[in-house]
Amino acid sequence: MDEDSVHGDSHLKTCVVLGGRGFIGRSLVSRLLRLGNWTVRVADSGHTLHLDESDSLLEDALSSGRASYHCVDVRDKPQIVKVTEGSYVVFYMGATDLRSHDYFDCYKVIVQGTRNVISACRESGVRKLIYNSTADVVFDGSQPIRDGDESLRRPLKFQSMLTDFKAQAEALIKLANNRDGLLTCALRSSIVFGPGDTEFVPFLVNLAKSGYAKFILGSGENISDFTYSENVSHAHICAVKALDSQMEFVAGKEFFITNLKPVRFWDFVSHIVEGLGYPRPSIKLPVRLVLYVFSLLKWTHEKEGLGSNYDTAHQYALLASSTRTFNCNAAKKHLGYTPVVTLEDGIASTLQWFSRDLEKSDDTIIQSTADQLLGCGKVADILLWRNEKKTFVSFLVLNLFYYWFFFSGNTFTSSAAQLLFIFAVALYGVSFVPSKIFGFQVNKIPPWRFEISESAVRDLSSDIVVVWNQGVRSFKSLSSGGDWIKFFKIAGSLYLLKLIVSRSLAAFLFTVMSFSFTGFFIYEQYELELYHLARIFVECLTFIKRMVIPVSDASSKPMFM
């Protein structure tokens, strides 16, 4: 449907966008203003309207009077009545400032707020109410959805309480149709993304920053439908005209809205995270194990009274591991909806916006734990492969030394003497090399390179003294016989050293050298994953401990008092 044909007459009509400063609300406001035949009342819970660089169109409209901003709390019906009076249509985009962990507040805003919006529209004589719903209201994660249409029934139980509330709100919108002249419909969009996204893409970015975006839940072959935000806005505007021309098929109905191009969920995620400079997902995890861990962590946090932030992660895990595609034939036929932005162009615009947003953020560069352990100096740069050429040369030189001392057939003393002899001859021979050979400059090693500064000698001497004094104190402590822990530490270390020297010192040194050039590098690459896995392991141990200790305490009590 051509948006310019939404109105048959030329004069401006007034619309209200409730939740107009939310992600999809902003997109709808911009599209309405670009059409030029609307006076837009932007209503949201914020006391003031904060504009940024992308809001130049709204800023001009506010100055010219084609747009106005109103602070409205949907829990307060008189405020809604006031802002909707005289309006032709109300777009209800949903709340933008939910405290997702306060379920009572969420219920008042989502469910009771929807009742207030419906009642206010009827009282103020609004003809059309279009509700921005979600495809989540037919999805509980228990079964895949393939080419689902509007005949799908809502689940009896939802995994997320917020989705349950949204399903209740959608039901209220449908029931309100054709009462006191009010026509209603609901648009169910599937996984909305776009510039200014505050939910899905930021969640992926946070996963990527924490290292979790490297994991694929399940096989990675599941298909999903995504919807670009501007296409959702376009569908809302199409619904306005359709409530007149196709009232019998649109009023009181719900419609699925997508980009009409199902893709693999993990291909989409890979485009986003890789486009923002993060590694693409590559490590597959069993879905059931992940969901069990989420449930365990949620239960532990709730039992400790720490609250829980695992609902979003749990919902994401269900979306990320299930096939979920929808049939939009009803929207195409009765609303005249077709996407105005392709999926590829939508992804490109989203990446461009978030790339600029990430550049503006002042993320402090934090040194990795591996870098700190290695002293954040030249040794760290070599072992962490910051300069691949230097690292390779260092590894090659150490391997040559290793071969020279352990596999040349000479004793350690003989090998050291021969090495010093070769070094001395090389230095002496370099002195006879001309400064230029065939026109190429030969850089000789200056004598000062072999000098050691007095401060370095003093620092080395101080370190030796500190180590010596620590050893003396340790021996004094051992001789007094008071510190058994220290005794076992020293005795164990000496015995381990004895085993290494007596068995195979060469094999031990080779293992240490190989680990140094690989272990620290691997640890730095997967530091966050290892940290979070360790955290989960500790949480599981804590859970097991709480389950076991009460039993132990009960069994230790005497049978007779």
From Swiss-Prot:
Residues 379-561 form the Reticulon domain. The chain crosses the membrane at residues 392-412, 420-440, 504-524. PROSITE patterns: RETICULON. Its main location: endoplasmic reticulum. One of its GO terms (molecular function) is 3-beta-hydroxysteroid dehydrogenase (NAD+)/C4-decarboxylase activity. Pfam families: 3Beta_HSD (PF01073), Reticulon (PF02453). It catalyses: a 3beta-hydroxysteroid-4alpha-carboxylate + NADP(+) = a 3-oxosteroid + CO2 + NADPH; a 3beta-hydroxysteroid-4alpha-carboxylate + NAD(+) = a 3-oxosteroid + CO2 + NADH. One of its GO terms (biological process) is sterol biosynthetic process. Pathway: Steroid biosynthesis; zymosterol biosynthesis; zymosterol from lanosterol: step 4/6. Its EC number is 1.1.1.170. One of its GO terms (cellular component) is endoplasmic reticulum membrane. NAD(+) binds at residue 166. Belongs to the 3-beta-HSD family. This is 3beta-hydroxysteroid-dehydrogenase/decarboxylase isoform 3. It comes from Arabidopsis thaliana (Mouse-ear cress).
